[in-house]
C-alpha cells in the first residue's frame, strides 16, 4: 500500500490536506466562533475535546511525514550512528563502556532500544517514527504551556504555527532522527510542567507533582545532549526565581519548593553518573563527554562570528526562515497590545523569552553551521509569539470593539504564520514522494552484500573511517566504542587516548569483519594516506589477524582468519 500511495502522489496529498483541514477546523473554529458567542464556543469544545485535538495533530503529522520514514538511506550520518549504538547497547548496555556518543549522551540512544520491544526493527523507519513521536510530544508541551495562561480555544490557535512548522517540514536535517530530538521534546514538556505549575492558584502550589516532573525532565536534558544543558538550566533558574519572588506563599514553602526543584533536576544526572562509575566508565565519560565537548566548542567559529552570520545559518533550513520571520511579525505587533495586559498574562511571554534566548545561545555555541542545531529554536520561538499573541488577545477584552480587535489578531496570526507555511508546502514538491522504489535500490549496496558474506546480524563489525551506514544496513553492532574514527584520525591532544581505547575495544570484541572505509566516494575520508595503515598498531593487528577479501566503492573489506577457516 505504501508503494501504491507513493506511485499515486495525488492520493497522498488528498489525505494529507484533509487531515490538515480537520486539524485546522479543530484549532480555529472554536476561537473564531468565540469572538461572538462564548456559549457556542464552549459547546464546540465539548464536541472537540483536548484528546481529539491531539489525535488530529498526530494524524496530520504522520500523514505528511510518512514518505520520509521509508527512505532506506541516512539523511544525516548521525542517523546510522544512533542505530549502531542502539545495536551495541543491546549487546552490552553500558554507555561510555560499550558506546561513546561524544556529542550526545545515553538518553538520546537508550530509547531506541525499545524499538524491538514494540515490534519494530533497528532501521531508519523505526528511528524516524520515534523522532516524529518526539515532535508530537514537543507540540503537546507547547500547546499545554499556552493553555495554562489562556482559554482552551485561544491556546489551540496559538500553537497552530508550531504544528504547521513540524507537520509541513521536509528539510532533510529536520526530518531525520537527530541528537536534538530528545532534548527539544524534553525542554518543551519540562517548560509546560513548570510554567503551568506557576500558573496554579497559590494554595495548590505547596506540593506539586508537576514541579518535580518538570525538574526531572529539564535536568535530564544534559544526559541527552550536553549542548542543551544551558537552556534547561536557564529555565530551571528562571522558574525558581519566579517562584521565590512570589509574595503570596510563605518563604519557608518557597525555599522548600526551590530545593525540591534543584534536587529533582539533579536526580537524573546523579543517577547516570553513579551507574557509569559502577561500571567503571566514569573516566571515559569525563574525557569524552565533558572535556571533548569543551574542546569542540573552542576549536570553531566565535560566538560573534555566528551572530554576524546567523541569518545565513537559518537560511540553510528552507522552512525555518519564513517561520522565524512570521514569529517576529506576530510577536512585534502583538507586543503593542500585550503591554496593556496584567502582569500575570505577560509572565508566560517573559519565560518564553528566556527560553528562546537560551536556545539561541545553545544553537550558536558550538560555532558550527550544522542545521540540526536550529531545531532548538522551533518551540521557544513559537511559544514566545504565541504567548505575546495570547496576552494581546486578553488585553483586547478591554477594548471598545473587542471582537474586532481580536478578529484582527486572528487574521495577523493566520496571515503571518499559518498561511505562508500552507502556501510554501502546497507550492513545493515533496522531495521524497514518488521516489521510494528508486531510492530503495540504494540499500542493495555491494559493500553491504560483501560484508554479509562473512558476518551476520548480531555479530560485531570493525570500522576505520566514517561510514556508519554499514552497521545499519547489516544489523551488526560496533566493535569499538565509537561508530566512526574521527578522533583516531584527526590530530588532537587526545588522539593517543582515543587510539589506545580503539585498540582495546577491537582486541576485546574481535569482529569477524573489519572495514577500512577510507577511500574514494566515502563520507569525509577519501585519501588513503589516513587509512588504517596510518595507525601502526592497528596496521600490524589487521595484518596479523585478518585478510583483505575485497575493495569495493572505496571500502576495503577484511575478514578474520579463523572465520575464513570455517566451512
Residue ranges, per PLM feature:
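Hydrophobic, aromatic-rich transmembrane alpha-helices
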Residues: 24-40, 319-346, 353, 357-358
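Short periplasmic/luminal acceptor-recognition loop of GT-C membrane glycosyltransferases, typified by
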Residues: 103, 229-233, 237, 426-430, ...
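Loop-to-helix entry region of an early transmembrane alpha helix in multi-pass inner-membrane enzymes
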Residues: 106, 110, 118-140
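Transmembrane-helix signature of polytopic, membrane-embedded enzymes
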Residues: 142-167, 184-185, 202-205, 350
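Membrane-interface transmembrane helices that cradle and orient dolichyl/undecaprenyl
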Residues: 150-153, 188-213, 244-249, 323-347, ...
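Membrane-interface alpha helices of multi-pass inner-membrane proteins
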Residues: 207-226, 232-237, 267, 356-365
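Hydrophobic/aromatic-rich transmembrane helices and adjacent perimembrane loops
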Residues: 230, 360-362, 366-404
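Perimembrane helix-loop-helix junctions
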Residues: 231-266, 336-343, 383, 389-399
Amino acid at each position: 500500500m505504501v508503494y501504491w500511495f507513493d506511485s499515486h502522489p495525488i492520493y497522498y496529498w488528498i489525505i494529507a490536506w484533509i487531515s490538515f483541514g480537520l486539524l485546522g477546523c479543530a484549532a480555529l473554529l472554536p476561537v473564531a466562533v468565540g469572538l461572538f458567542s462564548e456559549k457556542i464556543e464552549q459547546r464546540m469544545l465539548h464536541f472537540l475535546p483536548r484528546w481529539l485535538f491531539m489525535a488530529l495533530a498526530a494524524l496530520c503529522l504522520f500523514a505528511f511525514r510518512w514518505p520520509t520514514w521509508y527512505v532506506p538511506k541516512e539523511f544525516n550520518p548521525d542517523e546510522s550512528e544512533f542505530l549502531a549504538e542502539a545495536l551495541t547497547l543491546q549487546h552490552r548496555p553500558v554507555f561510555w563502556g560499550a558506546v561513546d556518543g561524544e556529542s550526545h549522551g545515553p538518553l538520546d540512544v537508550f530509547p531506541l532500544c525499545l524499538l524491538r520491544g514494540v515490534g519494530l526493527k533497528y532501521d531508519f523507519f523505526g528511528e524516524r517514527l520515534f523522532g516524529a513521536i518526539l515532535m508530537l510530544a514537543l507540540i503537546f508541551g507547547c500547546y499545554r504551556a499556552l493553555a495554562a495562561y489562556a482559554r482552551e480555544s485561544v491556546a489551540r490557535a496559538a500553537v497552530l504555527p508550531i504544528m504547521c512548522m513540524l507537520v509541513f517540514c521536509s528539510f532533510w536535517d529536520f526530518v531525520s532522527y537527530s541528537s536534538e530530538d530528545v532534548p527539544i521534546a524534553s525542554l518543551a514538556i519540562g517548560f509546560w510542567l513548570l510554567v503551568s505549575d506557576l500558573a496554579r492558584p497559590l494554595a495548590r502550589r505547596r506540593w506539586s507533582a508537576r514541579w518535580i516532573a518538570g525538574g526531572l525532565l529539564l535536568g535530564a536534558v544534559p544526559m541527552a545532549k550536553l549542548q542543551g544543558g544551558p537552556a534547561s538550566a536557564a529555565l530551571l533558574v528562571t522558574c525558581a526565581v519566579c517562584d521565590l519572588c512570589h509574595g503570596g506563599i510563605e518563604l519557608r514553602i518557597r525555599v522548600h519548593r526551590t530545593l525540591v526543584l534543584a534536587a529533582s533536576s539533579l536526580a537524573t544526572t546523579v543517577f547516570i553518573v553513579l551507574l557509569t562509575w559502577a561500571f567503571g566508565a566514569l573516566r571515559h565519560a569525563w574525557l569524552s563527554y565533558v572535556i571533548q565537548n569543551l574542546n569542540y566548542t573552542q576549536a570553531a567559529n566565535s560566538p560573534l562570528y555566528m551572530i554576524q552570520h546567523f541569518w545565513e545559518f537559518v537560511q540553510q533550513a528552507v522552512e525555518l526562515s519564513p517561520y522565524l520571520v512570521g514569529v517576529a511579525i506576530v510577536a512585534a505587533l502583538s507586543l503593542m497590545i500585550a503591554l496593556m495586559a496584567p502582569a500575570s498574562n505577560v509572565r508566560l511571554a517573559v519565560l518564553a523569552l528566556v527560553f528562546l534566548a537560551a536556545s539561541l545561545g545553545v544553537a550558536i555555541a558550538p560555532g558550527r553551521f550544522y542545521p540540526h542545531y536550529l531545531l532548538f529554536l522551533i518551540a521557544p520561538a513559537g511559544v514566545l509569539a504565541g504567548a505575546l499573541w495570547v496576552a494581546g488577545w486578553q488585553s483586547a477584552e478591554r477594548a471598545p470593539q473587542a471582537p474586532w480587535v481580536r478578529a484582527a489578531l486572528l487574521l495577523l496570526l493566520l496571515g503571518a504564520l499559518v498561511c505562508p507555511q500552507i502556501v510554501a508546502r502546497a507550492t513545493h514538491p515533496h522531495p521524497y514522494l514518488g521516489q521510494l522504489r528508486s531510492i530503495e535500490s540504494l540499500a542493495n549496496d555491494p559493500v553491504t552484500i560483501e560484508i554479509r558474506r562473512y558476518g551476520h546480524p548480531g555479530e560485531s563489525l570493525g570500522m576505520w573511517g566514517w561510514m556508519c551506514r554499514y552497521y545499519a544496513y547489516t544489523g551488526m553492532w560496533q566493535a569499538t566504542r565509537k561508530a566512526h574514527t574521527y578522533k583516531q584520525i584527526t590530530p588532537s591532544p587526545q588522539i593517543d587516548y582515543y587510539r589506545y581505547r580503539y585498540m582495546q575495544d577491537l582486541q576485546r570484541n574481535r569482529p569477524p569483519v573489519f572495514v577500512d572505509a577510507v577511500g574514494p566516494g566515502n563520507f569525509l575520508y577519501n585519501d588513503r594516506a589516513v587509512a588504517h595503515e596510518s595507525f601502526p598498531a592497528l596496521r600490524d593487528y589487521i595484518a596479523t589477524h585478518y585478510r583483505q577479501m575485497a575493495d569495493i566503492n572505496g571500502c576495503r573489506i577484511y575478514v578474520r582468519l579463523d572465520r575464513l577457516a570455517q566451512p
